[in-house]
Amino acid sequence: MRMMPIASGSSGNCIYLGTEDTHVLFDAGISRKRIEEGLNTAGLSLKDIDAIFVTHEHIDHTKGIGVISRKDGIPIYSTSGTIEGIEQISSLGNIPDGIFNKINADEDISIGDVTVHPFRISHDANEPVAYTFTQKCADGIKKASVVTDLG
């Protein structure tokens, strides 16, 4: 399992987490170009990404979603409240139908060889969540959590 922050802070957030077979992003709060550059440093590109999990709708977590959804068609997972919030951000432009996958806190999602578990957090947003990423492998279970913007 590999975890790599591409950006973190009030100017934008994006974290890569992956295994040999499965590659996901948590948030896309920077430009598509910056995400691609960050992935390139790890020998990856947006073509390798299987899914994007969004913690909440604030622009420092969603800035790249519009362009990525139109150019790359990567499935985006988040809660209903977060998706509704994202759809209200006009600067993201048109997001294609079928890109969003609604999830519920405390209900696991399987992507490739991993399980992603969303859980509720406290933040001033619509239905914000954090995520635990779990991989079962020959040498046991590996876990990592992505928790941003608490309070």
Predicted features along the sequence, with ranges:
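Conserved beta-strand hairpin/beta-sheet module of binuclear metal-dependent hydrolase folds
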Residues: 1-42, 128-149
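Structured catalytic core of nucleotide-sugar glycosyltransferases
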Residues: 4-14, 56-61, 116-118
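Beta-strand->loop->alpha-helix junctions that form or flank phosphate-binding loops
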Residues: 7, 51, 100-104
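Short secondary-structure boundary/capping segments
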Residues: 7, 16, 43, 66, ...
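A generic "binding-loop/recognition-motif" signal
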Residues: 11, 31, 58, 82, ...
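Active-site metal-binding motif and surrounding structural segment of the metallo-beta-lactamase
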Residues: 32-78
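Conserved Rossmann-like nucleotide-binding pocket used by diverse enzymes
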Residues: 53, 117, 146
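Metallo-beta-lactamase
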Residues: 80-141
